[in-house]
């Protein structure tokens, strides 16, 4: 791993953050999930029957989304996640290769690929997730994949699963010990209630930073106010960034005062993947020497790009049309 950058944008060696092979930018390593996203939009569902709507298929998974947005921002990206030896796995591998995202391990796992069903009905989103091959994260492979990283993203999802918790925790700890900018993302608020969220907090304390949206922060702390929640979380993990949608984010470090960082005004088309784009922008700015508040500003700017298009990944264009319309 590459030591953390100082305020001048240089790491502990006195050199700029390490560039990824084949990329002009630093290498962001993302640990977590690779999924097929199936997005269903309908005004209302007919229980037990058919209804007209739209169905979109595309690559996803929180860590994969972060990697895709890191590449869109000009950085290198390495994804540590599982894919199955099936049609979905081959499609996902092709999507990663098209964007220049390195996948570790390169070999498919002996199971189906992960999938996420997103149903948007009357303005509400519901999710059904099957982690599939992502349950096959190996601790030694995960830690080995961190070599050369200028920054590290650890999704909360593998921390919330007993099968992958040790590997994700090891990634957070290795990054923290190396002094590399690293974050743990809180994943999803329904999964964090009570003691269930403790592995996420423990890993974030090792990495030094927790990213959470308003609902996740409230679930972890009991405080609905983002500023109060950020302060409570920062006292536990070091730095907390609470995302608040169009209102921006609140950043708090240690025992300091929470600092609001506004988001750019933009017309939102699809908020899917916005938090993951934020994470990519935040980490790349931290790797370049920005402080937490400055990095949060960079994150909101990349998130603004994400909400201006459909899908969790920045779309390639094929024949003038978006790959994922």
PLM-predicted stretches and their roles:
Residues 1-29, 51, 174, 224-325:
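Conserved phosphate-binding/catalytic region of the ribokinase-like
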Residues 33-34, 157, 277:
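Active-site metal-binding loops of divalent metal-dependent hydrolases
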Residues 162-168:
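Active-site-adjacent beta->alpha loops and helix N-cap segments on the catalytic face
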């Amino acid at each position: 791993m590459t030591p953390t950058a100082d305020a001048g944008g240089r790491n502990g060696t006195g050199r700029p953050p390490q560039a990824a092979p084949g990329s002009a930018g630093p290498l962001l390593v993302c640990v977590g999930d690779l999924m097929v996203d199936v997005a269903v939009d309908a005004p209302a569902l007919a229980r037990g029957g058919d209804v007209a709507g739209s169905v979109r298929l595309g690559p996803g998974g929180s860590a994969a989304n972060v990697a895709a947005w890191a590449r869109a921002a000009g950085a290198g990206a390495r994804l540590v996640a599982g894919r199955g030896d099936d049609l979905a796995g081959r499609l996902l591998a092709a999507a990663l290769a098209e964007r220049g995202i390195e996948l570790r391990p390169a070999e498919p796992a002996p199971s189906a690929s992960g999938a996420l069903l997103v149903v948007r009905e009357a303005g509400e989103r519901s999710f059904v997730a099957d982690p599939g091959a992502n349950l096959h994260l190996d601790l030694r492979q995960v830690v080995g994949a961190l070599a050369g990283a200028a920054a590290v993203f650890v999704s909360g999802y593998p921390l919330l699963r007993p099968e992958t918790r040790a590997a994700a925790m090891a990634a957070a700890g290795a990054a923290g010990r190396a002094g590399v900018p690293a974050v743990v993302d809180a994943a999803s608020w329904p999964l964090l209630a009570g003691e269930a969220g403790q592995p996420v907090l423990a890993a974030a304390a090792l990495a030094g930073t927790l990213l959470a949206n308003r609902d996740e922060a409230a679930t972890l702390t009991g405080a609905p106010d983002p500023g109060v929640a950020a302060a409570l979380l920062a006292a536990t993990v070091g730095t907390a960034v609470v995302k608040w949608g169009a209102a921006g984010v609140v950043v708090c470090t240690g025992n300091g005062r929470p600092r609001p960082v506004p988001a750019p005004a933009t017309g939102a088309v699809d908020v899917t993947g916005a938090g993951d784009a934020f994470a990519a922008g935040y980490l790349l700015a931290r790797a370049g020497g920005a402080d937490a508040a400055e990095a949060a500003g960079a994150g909101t700017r990349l998130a603004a790009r994400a909400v201006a298009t459909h899908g969790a990944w920045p779309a390639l264009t094929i024949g003038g049309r978006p790959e994922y319309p």
